[in-house]
From Swiss-Prot:
Binds 2 [4Fe-4S] clusters per subunit. One of its GO terms (cellular component) is chloroplast thylakoid membrane. It holds the Pfam family Fer4. Residues 55-84, 95-124 form the 4Fe-4S ferredoxin-type domain. This is NAD(P)H-quinone oxidoreductase subunit I, chloroplastic. [4Fe-4S] cluster 2 binds at residues 74, 104, 107, 110. It comes from the Eukaryota. NDH is composed of at least 16 different subunits, 5 of which are encoded in the nucleus. It is found in: Plastid, Chloroplast thylakoid membrane. Keywords: 4Fe-4S, Chloroplast, Iron, Iron-sulfur, Membrane, Metal-binding, NAD, NADP, Plastid, Plastoquinone, Quinone, Repeat, Thylakoid, Translocase.
Length: 166
């Protein structure tokens, strides 16, 4: 008879413990209920990009000396640098520079180690296309400056949102 009573007491203790855990979880859920939502409506509202955001790479053709440091420091040897040696002035002349953003991991090593600072990271992150071959950017496409997200009047950022009155 005693084993049955102890089993019943253990069952009661386990039930109380389970109810306490459920109550604790419910209290945490209720504490998050009166916070403002974190999600945004993406195409119409955009977050403000941080200063160190690693987006699309911007390339300045005139500054590049075709040293290929960017290719050597890239973990996947991604930038394609075509150059020709000018024998009369004994310098390399850059012919073509391209990066395939379908393969790029946006590590930023090429930007960090470039001796002439001809590469920089922009805040542009909308690179989606229907064809993966469109992600192979040459020096002309890499040289385009992105339109700033904050200055675009058609897009509401977190700063321009109307305040919610409670």
């Amino acid at each position: 008879m005693f084993p049955m009573v102890t089993e019943f007491m253990n069952y009661g203790q386990q039930t109380v413990r389970a109810a306490r855990y459920i109550g604790q979880g419910f209290m945490i859920t209720l504490s998050h209920a009166n916070r403002l939502p974190v999600t945004i409506q993406y195409p119409y509202e955009k977050l403000i990009i941080s200063e160190r955001f690693r987006g699309r790479i911007h390339f300045e053709f005139d500054k590049c000396i075709a040293c290929e440091v960017c290719v050597r420091v890239c973990p996947i040897d991604l930038p394609v640098v075509d150059w020709k040696l000018e024998t009369d002035i004994r310098k390399k002349r850059l012919l073509n520079y391209s990066i395939d953003f379908g393969i790029c991991i946006f590590c930023g090593n090429c930007v960090e180690y470039c001796p002439t600072n001809c590469l920089s990271m922009t805040e542009e992150y909308e690179l989606s296309t229907y064809d993966r071959h469109e992600l192979n950017y040459n020096q002309i496409a890499l040289g385009r400056l992105p339109m700033s997200i904050i200055d675009d009047y058609t897009i509401r950022t977190i700063l321009n949102l109307p305040e919610i009155k409670t």
